[in-house]
């Protein structure tokens, strides 16, 4: 493919625990401070924090947060991406939403759930690899723990960028950095990794 210039802004948000309205307010302000990007990427479960018990905090599939993402993408003429705890059809998903400026929404449900925290007991794992095409760039959508499973992200010549959103604790941050580089090297692709910052009731996060 011909070289394509794309400006990506990663938003390493300090997520307010289980407070979607406050987190959307923070995300909107962060985007507004950084105009002119092609793609804005928010962390894993950016409206709630890494909620391993989604009951009571998960949003509906067609939530106000998703409608905000659609409005923001249109206003910025850019794509907006981030994962949400979603209830859909009576099941819970850790769902990465990629919203195009024209309002199209493409989604990827987290395949590799973090068993150490019990995520698999409450969420349903995804079954599909998802590659979106945006402004001529093919982007593989991935969520957090999938970074440790190289076969799932194997580049079959079908993507240019692997995009990971995460809530990756500071205690394992060296692995985060090393694995991002490894996925880039072995797949001969660009990698974008977006990790949150701050604290929640479970862990501390340092972004990069």
Q: What positions do the PLM features span?
A:
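Active-site catalytic loop in hydrolytic enzyme cores
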Residues: 87-157, 170-178, 205
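CN hydrolase (nitrilase-like) catalytic-core segments centered on the catalytic cysteine
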Residues: 63-78, 148-208
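Glycine/Thr-rich phosphate-binding loops of Rossmann-like dinucleotide-binding domains
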Residues: 18, 50, 172
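Short beta-strand segments enriched in small/hydrophobic residues
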Residues: 2-14
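Active-site beta-strand/loop signature of hydrolases that rely on acidic residues for catalysis
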Residues: 8-11, 23, 31-57, 73, ...
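Catalytic metal-binding/acid-base residues of hydrolase active sites
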Residues: 14-16, 46, 85-86, 113, ...
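Residues at alpha-helix caps and immediate loop-helix transition turns in enzyme cores, especially N-
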Residues: 20-23, 53-54, 92, 175-176
């Amino acid at each position: 493919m011909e070289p394509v210039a794309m400006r990506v802004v990663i938003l390493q948000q300090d997520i307010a625990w289980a407070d979607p309205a406050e987190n959307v307010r923070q995300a909107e302000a962060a985007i507004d401070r950084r105009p002119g990007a092609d793609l804005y990427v928010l962390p894993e479960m950016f409206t709630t924090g890494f909620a391993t018990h989604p009951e009571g905090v998960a949003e509906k599939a067609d939530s106000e947060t998703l409608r905000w993402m659609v409005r923001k993408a249109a206003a910025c003429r850019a794509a907006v991406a981030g994962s949400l705890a979603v209830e859909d059809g009576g099941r819970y998903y850790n769902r990465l939403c990629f919203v195009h400026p024209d309002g199209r929404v493409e989604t990827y449900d987290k395949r590799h759930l973090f068993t150490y925290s019990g995520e698999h007991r409450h969420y349903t794992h995804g079954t599909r690899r998802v590659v979106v095409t945006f402004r001529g760039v093919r982007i593989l959508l991935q969520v957090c723990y999938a970074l440790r499973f190289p076969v799932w992200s194997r580049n079959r010549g079908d993507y240019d960028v692997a995009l990971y959103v995460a809530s990756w604790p500071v205690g394992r941050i060296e692995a985060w950095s090393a694995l991002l580089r490894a996925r880039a090297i072995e797949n001969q692709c660009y990698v974008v990794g977006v990790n949150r910052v701050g604290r929640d009731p479970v862990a501390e996060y340092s972004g990069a």
